[in-house]
Amino acid sequence: MRRGFGPLALTLFLFFFALLTLPGDGNQGSVAGSCYCDRTIPSGTQIPPATLNHMRKYLKTFHRCQFFIRFQLQSKSVCGGSQDQWVRELVNCFEHKQCGIGHGQSFHHQKHVPQASTRIPEATEGKPPDTSTAVQFQSTQQSTFPSGAPSLNKELTRHWETTILPSGYGLEARPVAEANEKQHKQQKEPGAGAGTQALVPVLSLLAIVFFLVAAMVCVLCNRRVTRQSSSGLQLCYTPVEPRPQGL
């Protein structure tokens, strides 16, 4: 008869099983291999700039394992020595939110978008406007746009001249605003003229119908009068019998 496992063997089995499933400390992973890396870069290896920029752009998070640091990208994980220069730079960049998914794009956008902080002072009563500030604002606005968009720059400059200058920044721009307003009124007037022109055929048609109805009424009245007069003549006519001739 076979004897089962004793208490000592069962205890040793549970002890080794607990060692295999023991979780790691923080982000270091576990002994079972939760710090698995798809690609491990040996220490002292020179990283190409293109590869490093790719990692900065698509970095999601990183984990501090026991002897290395694992960087989790979108499709794979890359591990490197914790003492390597590129590893420390990448960790520092991600911790300061200067790279990674969602961080690097906003940082790149803030880096390339110019900040226009120039403001135009409002004109006060009794004080002439500061033309130097207006010229400085115009030059700043022109330098903000790239050289490949001249039409947009011209449209914005024209809009700035027609909206800001007529409010008291220059008398020379008032005729331009008045001409624009006059042109706007002229554009509205053809619409009213078109409505009047559309009513003319309708009125003409109504007049023609009225004259036709009047002519038909006159014709019917004339026919009735003619019939009545002919019947009256028949009533007034009395036939006369011929007298008998004497023998």
From Swiss-Prot:
Residues 120-152 are annotated as: Disordered. The keyword Glycoprotein applies. GO terms for molecular function: chemokine activity; chemokine receptor binding; low-density lipoprotein particle receptor activity; scavenger receptor activity. The keyword Secreted does not apply. Its main location: membrane. Induction: By interleukin-18 and the induction is strongly mediated by an activator protein-1-dependent pathway. It is found in: Membrane. Glycosylated. Disulfide bonds join 35-65, 37-79. Residues 27-198 are extracellular. Keywords: Chemotaxis, Cytokine, Disulfide bond, Glycoprotein, Membrane, Signal, Transmembrane, Transmembrane helix. Residues 131-147 have a biased composition (Low complexity). It is a single-pass type I membrane protein. It comes from the Eukaryota. Residues 1-26 form the signal peptide. InterPro entries: CXCL16 (IPR026296), CXCL16_dom (IPR048585). Residues 220-247 are cytoplasmic. The chain crosses the membrane at residues 199-219. Belongs to the intercrine alpha (chemokine CxC) family. Induces a strong chemotactic response. Induces calcium mobilization. Binds to CXCR6/Bonzo. Also acts as a scavenger receptor on macrophages, which specifically binds to OxLDL (oxidized low density lipoprotein), suggesting that it may be involved in pathophysiology such as atherogenesis. PANTHER family: C-X-C MOTIF CHEMOKINE 16, CXC CHEMOKINE LIGAND. This is C-X-C motif chemokine 16.
